[in-house]
Regions:
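Short amphipathic helix-loop junctions that connect adjacent transmembrane helices
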Residues: 27-41, 229-244
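Helix-to-loop junctions at the C-terminal end of transmembrane segments
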Residues: 58-69, 259-273, 357
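Juxtamembrane intracellular "pre-TM" segments in multi-pass secondary transporters
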Residues: 1-5, 181-214
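C-terminal transmembrane helical hairpin of 12-TM major facilitator-type secondary transporters
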Residues: 274-318
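Helix-breaking motifs and short loop linkers at transmembrane-helix boundaries and internal kinks
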Residues: 37, 69, 90-95, 294-295
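Residue-level signature of mid-helix packing/kink "hotspots" within the transmembrane helices
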Residues: 23, 51-59, 109, 142-143, ...
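Cytoplasmic helix-loop-helix junction between adjacent transmembrane helices
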Residues: 100-139
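Conserved MFS/SLC helix-loop-helix module at the cytosolic interface between two early adjacent transmembrane helices
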Residues: 55-92
Length: 395
């Protein structure tokens, strides 16, 4: 791992700048959609469009990165990000705003190439620690991004956040172009078809990968459902406003940055990735299911820390295990399949939980989300202990 640290730092910076741009735009989406007369359904369409496009692109871009290398994919998606944010800034209609989110969603599929990059430069025993670096970039991006977006909108008007995000994407492109080397050696490149969904079926049929793929589908489904139900419930029950919701997301980001930025590496010295995965899944199930029984903001914030901690140990452990069970020339493909399933969960979760919340009760919504996490926890129990660094999917 010491030899990989300079390149880990570079890929960390790449993902961090990417996520800051993402974080800049997300908090202002409701207001942007309202400018064009679109409210609940329109806002949901903007969120869903991103996740739906990411569902298709993560597997495709991961597969393509196994063929042409990680660097070209990362650079190309940075160009797409800049274009998407520029369109977002100047979109004259809701339709073009939706197109901007579709572009951003496709570019967001580059996470599979970024994770494959980490897998290329780390050993199997160090892989989950390297994935934790990616997680820390996510956490810090969500901390800094919304604040930058709010300041930009206040000082420069409605187009400013998109312009700032586009500028960051250009900075990211230039820095990566000059300092990010290719990580995939020529002998590990795979020349296969680029249609990714047959490989999704292969991954689900693979004995060692199947439970991990279920975890990757269920966890984003439950977590995204939780993030939809929580603001609705907290505003009516605890009388939360924008400030309290802002604190909630900052808490999640701070805990993620702290855990995945250092604590996770310490934990992996004494606890296996499999055990961290199982523990994290149970912690998330409990912290989601308990919410409707809480009566005070302080207890909700406390359980938010539990939720964020559990997610922060579960996510890099799950990513590391997926990478460990994949062959060297299939890292992008398999990680792309996992990320595609995650995007599918993020796409379906808000819709399902919204229907449950409206048609039944807030209690039912949280119990459905928590129950889904329990199913994911049960799936995690089926993850075998890694015996060897690489297991081919034979795809």
């Amino acid at each position: 791992m010491p030899a990989a640290r300079p390149r880990l730092a570079i890929i960390w910076l790449t993902v961090f700048i990417d996520l800051v741009g993402f974080g800049i735009v997300i908090p202002i989406l409701p207001f942007y959609s309202a400018r064009f007369g679109a409210h609940g359904m329109g806002y949901g369409a903007l969120i869903g469009a991103f996740s739906l496009m990411q569902f298709f692109s993560t597997a495709l871009l991961g597969r393509l990165s196994d063929r042409v290398g990680r660097r070209p994919i990362l650079l190309a998606t940075m160009v797409l990000n800049a274009a998407g944010y520029l369109l977002f800034a100047f979109a004259p209609s809701f339709l073009l705003l939706l197109v901007a989110r579709l572009i951003a969603g496709f570019a967001g599929g580059n996470i599979s190439a970024a994770q494959a990059y980490v897998a290329d430069i780390t050993s199997a025993s160090e892989r989950s620690k390297g994935m934790g670096v990616i997680g820390m970039a996510f956490g810090l991006g969500f901390i800094f991004g919304p604040g930058i977006g709010s300041i930009a909108a206040r000082l420069g008007g409605h187009a400013a956040p998109g312009l700032v995000a586009a500028g960051l994407s250009v900075v990211n492109l230039l820095s990566a172009f000059f300092i990010l080397p290719e990580s995939l050696r020529a002998e590990h490149r795979a020349v296969r078809d680029l249609w990714p969904f047959g490989h999704m079926a292969d991954a689900l049929a693979h004995r060692e990968l199947r439970p991990l793929m279920l975890v990757w589908l269920i966890t984003p489904f439950a977590f995204s459902a939780y993030t939809v139900a929580l603001p609705l419930w907290a505003t009516t029950t605890l009388h939360w406003h924008e400030q309290e919701l802002g604190i909630f997301f900052v808490v999640v980001g701070l805990v993620a940055a702290f855990v995945q930025g250092g604590l996770f590496r310490l934990l992996t010295r004494v606890v296996s990735d499999r055990r961290l995965l199982i523990t994290g899944m149970m912690g998330m199930a409990l912290s989601i299911g308990v919410v409707p029984f809480l009566a005070h903001s302080a207890t909700l914030y406390a359980w938010t820390v539990v939720l964020a901690f559990s997610n922060s140990i579960m996510s890099p452990a799950a990513t590391g295990l997926v990478s460990t069970f994949a062959a060297a020339n299939e890292q992008g493909t398999v990680l792309g399949v996992a990320q595609s399933l995650g995007a599918l969960g993020r796409f379906t979760g808000p819709f399902v939980i919204g229907v449950v919340y409206d048609w039944t009760s807030p209690l039912a919504a949280f119990l459905v989300a928590g129950g889904a996490m329990l199913v994911g926890w049960a799936a995690s129990l089926g993850v075998p202990k890694p015996r060897r660094p690489d297991v081919s999917l034979s795809v």
